[in-house]
Amino acid sequence: MIKYKAIINLVFIAVFFNNAMSQTVKKEKPNIIFILTDDQRFDAIGYAGNKFVNTPEMDKLAQQGTYFDHAIVTTPICAASRASLWTGLHERSHNFNFQTGNVREEYMNNAYPKLLKNNGYYTGFYGKYGVRYDNLESQFDEFESYDRNNRYKDKRGYYYKTINNDTVHLTRYTGQQAIDFIDKNATNTQPFMLSLSFSAPHAHDGAPEQYFWQTTTDALLQDTTLPGPDLADEKYFLAQPQAVRDGFNRLRWTWRYDDPEKYQHSLKGYYRMISGIDLEIKKIRDKLKEKGVDKNTVIIVMGDNGYFLGERQLAGKWLMYDNSIRVPLIVFDPRVNKHQDISEMVLNIDVTQTIADLAGVKAPESWQGKSLLPLVKQETSTISRDTILIEHLWDFENIPPSEGVRTEEWKYFRYVNDKTIEELYNIKKDPKEINNLIGKKKYQNVAKALREKLDELIAKNSDEFRAGPSDLTVELIRQPESEVKIFDLKPEFGWTVPLSSKYQSAYQLLVASSETIINANNGDVWDSGQVRSSQSTNVDFGGKPLKIGETYYWKVRIWDEENRLVDYSKAQKFTIGESDNYIISTENKFVTDKIKPSKFENRDGVYFIDFGKAAFATMEFNYQAKTPHTLTIRVGEMIDENGNVNRTPPAKSNIRYQELKVEVKPGQTRYRIPIQTDERNTRPNKAIPLPKGFPPLLPFRYAEIEGAQSSINANDVEQLAYHTFWDEKASSFKSDNNILNQVWDLSKYSIKATTFNGLYVDGDRERIPYEADAYLNQLSHYTTDREYAMARRTIEYFMKNPTWPTEWQQHVALLLYADYMYTGNTELVERYYEALKHKSLYELSNEDGLITSTKVDAEFMKKLGFPEGYKKPLTDIVDWPGANFNGSKTPGERDGFVFQPYNTVINSFFYENMKIMAQFAKILGKTDEVLDFELRAAKAKKAVNEQMFDKKRGIYVDGIGTDHASLHANMMPLAFGLVPQEHVDTVVEFVKSRGMACSVYGAQFLLDGLYNVGEADYALDLLASTSERSWYNMIRIGSTITLEAWDNKYKNNLDWNHAWGAVPANAIPRGLWGIKPKTAGFGIASIKPQMGKLKSSQITVPTVRGAIHATFTHNGPRSQTYEIEIPGNMVAEFSLDDIDGKDLIHNGQKVPAAFGAVQLSPGKHIIELKINSF
């Protein structure tokens, strides 16, 4: 019993304390009523001196409170202005208009009703909410959102709500909701915040009568003829830009004001509807007094935007004139009880800040207004604002967007879609804005200062969500501004969609003839207009063909996933050139890196220099000779056992070394070494010559200078390394395996270093493009940089310059397919489809669907692009080199492959070629050929598995007629998906038993095959191996660019600068991390990591749409974490092998295993793999 009484006492004390605290809170915090009207302009109130509108209650509030006679909305359109009021932000920030989706949650989380609701206020709303937002429950304790009913084209637009079964005008309905709200909540312990939004005096646009008022105001102005509008002469209309003359401002003028009868009806209706609101305000104030809360209830009255009442022969709002942006604003705080009129410019977004200040709630830092409470309480005479930003940014066909600034004396504005259309007014001397001073010499400095201020305020009030597209490309070329000539007269454009926009729903692309024109947002060469498309790569130029030799500028803007328009990108310059041969793919510029020594030593008068890495380069140095003499310069790729430049590289090898003489003399201080050209790699019509303007180049890392009579220091010497355009930051990789990290660095650098010659070449020995070399080079180039030009030009080169190996011809389809998948561009497919059909070798097939090179004749060689009289026949190669190559006693790189007329390697490539050709035929709309190539692929797969597979051993033999089984005969079917699932285990077991029994070229397909079937551990073992047949061996023997072979012993004429040895540069992103395009151009990315024994890894992979970033952490045997960031305008599918018995958790939510993959949208994702997480 005692316990029971104690509990009762505690409850009583708690209730009493809570009530006492609530009453204290209520006493400290006022009730707030914010009344918003629709289209009520600044002078449509009696207190402003208007004799025709009857607003006694508004006038009384103005007389008793603070009246702001220069209140301005930051944007003169109801939807955007209301969004500004809710969020406290300029339109430029919240970016909401009639055609967008919801206001961003990030902004609505800081909306003033939610802020007050979360800080002890009871919040209510009735009327026109005016913006799209689906969670009003989070803002209001009670609410009803409604507006004019646009289903009705008559008075029912305003008359469809009922009170006690009587249909009433919306103004009356809203007023009654306010009265009922006060009746229920005035005596509550919580203070209340009531937001009322009247639809009046907005016209009902769909109805011929336009304006509908209540009978209570019907008698007003009955016997009055209202005076006509100011600036009614047609010259004021004709002074408007064409877009305004053709737009909604003019159209709505014809609805309301274009004859005296319409004008009188509309203007009287407008005033009567305002008077109807005034009657409701009277009832509301009476109810406050009745409930005894009138002394502690602040009332704010404001219009959402201004309005044209026939001035300039216009109606509506939207423009930057004062008629459109100025509104009435009254703040009546009965606790102050001091009337004042304030002429300072104040904004709608100040009201948001003022409401928070009245409630004693700290305003979010993101809000952009200023509290007016210090002015209302007369604690200050100014809020210190000299210039305001005004804007109407909704890009709508019938209303031209504009932006400007206003001071007490000046107004400047311009039209967004043509910034050359500007207006400047001295509003102090010319308040009606009649005399446009723009272009007048006397006011040039004023206009310039205001333009700069506008740009400053635009930048200040733009946040991350305004960011425009970036990383612009023309013909897939980044930064084409200088040293690049675009060959396509109708080029394709591309850009990266900002991550803040997530997806693109539309774009507008401008091409202009000058920087001035593009900066004014004019596309005098081509304006795409708004194109409803998500395409952000390979966007075709749609104008007349561009002119050779001319320079152009372009930029683009997009609409995001919610149809919000963001800013234009920065403009990009490009120049049209002309190809000097049949190749149409634009060549990118070359870059020369000036590299200082990483080691510089004076060794008994011989200067030894280590530049850290080998490069295709020359060398320059500063030297001050006092007398003429000769310096001996040695450069090379190797050092000897004593750490000096190796003057005798291995016999037969193509490891480079040169000794050069440089004559020096007084008066000359800068010298370049005279590198000697090599006869073989400069053969006319065989080797690819260096680009025009290049000096002779040699791959070298080390140098020595002997014979110097004056001192030389490290800063005097530079290695000039030549390569194509390269972004080092485009890709990256790290893991907990140091060997793997070194292999990645070696491979990535190899791709950069070997791009010196304009096309992919096979190394310095020959400097000739080969199809297989190029394919491996391309894959690694595409996964290490967002650079496609060299690969595309090399593909075109092969169309007329084929090489002799059978499989190399089959690599051309692989090259084109990789380019298509990584870029999404079909230009080369369209141009070379017919020639590619020949290179796929489908004409060599037998009735079973297998091909043989023995069928090749001279006529077919011509089809492949070989010149008339070419002697060497098409020959199967499998791998390179063969046994006993070049006089050596080595087994070669073919694992003992036994050549047969019909062999497994050739037909594995053929199967892949047929699949690719079917896809290309589909792209080109060649339906019959799609079926033909699909059938050929199916027949080839069936025949290979029936005629080249040893069922007893469960492995593939080298060809029909032999029982020998090589690594190559088994890794190729694995790489191309030929192996039936029931035979994968035996094939994999055999492959693993052979080790790295293939060349650095074959390693591409070995790793592809292993990752295709989930052999992650073994693939990782190969990548991070330290054996003699490994990439680490290349590092160990001293090279910084990948070798042509695993070691000199396996190919005695090898060079130390062969990109086909850089397979890990693509195997790590494509295999270990499993990041590939699932659809062309990375519209959908596939991410299927196979980390094997790694404990941690992070990677950046470039794509045509932006970089994919990923991190892996092995937290322990029961938990792994992947963090993935997907760029804008891309989706990805993330999957893992063997997730049975494990939980996949995406951003905290468990993913049903049946889905098989996690769908990733643009942005950051955390994916956890947990074992038995229950």
From Swiss-Prot:
Its cofactor is Ca(2+). Its main location: periplasm. It is found in: Periplasm. One of its GO terms (biological process) is carbohydrate metabolic process. One of its GO terms (molecular function) is metal ion binding. The active site is at C78 (nucleophile), E766 (proton donor), E1044 (proton acceptor). The keyword Signal applies. It is an enzyme of class 3 (hydrolase). It catalyses: Hydrolysis of terminal non-reducing alpha-L-rhamnose residues in alpha-L-rhamnosides. Residues 569-1174 are annotated as: Alpha-L-rhamnosidase. One of its GO terms (cellular component) is periplasmic space. It comes from the Bacteria. InterPro entries: 6-hairpin_glycosidase_sf, 6hp_glycosidase-like_sf, Alkaline_phosphatase_core_sf, Alpha_rhamnosid, Bac_rhamnosid6H, Bac_rhamnosid_C, Ig-like_fold, Sulfatase_N. Residues 22-568 are annotated as: Ulvan-active sulfatase. Disulfide bonds: none annotated. Its EC number is 3.1.6.-, 3.2.1.40. The conversion to 3-oxoalanine (also known as C-formylglycine, FGly), of a serine or cysteine residue in prokaryotes and of a cysteine residue in eukaryotes, is critical for catalytic activity. This post-translational modification is severely defective in multiple sulfatase deficiency (MSD). The modification 3-oxoalanine (Cys) is found at C78. Induction: By ulvan and rhamnose. Alpha-L-rhamnose binds at D764, R765, E766, H1058. Bifunctional enzyme containing sulfatase and alpha-L-rhamnosidase activities involved in ulvan degradation. Ulvan is the main polysaccharide component of the Ulvales (green seaweed) cell wall. It is composed of disaccharide building blocks comprising 3-sulfated rhamnose (Rha3S) linked to D-glucuronic acid (GlcA), L-iduronic acid (IduA), or D-xylose (Xyl). The sulfatase specifically desulfates L-rhamnose at the 3-position and can act on the motif Rha3S-Xyl-Rha3S in an exolytic mode of action, producing Rha-Xyl-Rha3S. In the N-terminal section; belongs to the sulfatase family. This is Bifunctional sulfatase/alpha-L-rhamnosidase. It comes from Formosa agariphila (strain DSM 15362 / KCTC 12365 / LMG 23005 / KMM 3901 / M-2Alg 35-1). The lineage of its organism: Bacteria, Pseudomonadati, Bacteroidota, Flavobacteriia, Flavobacteriales.
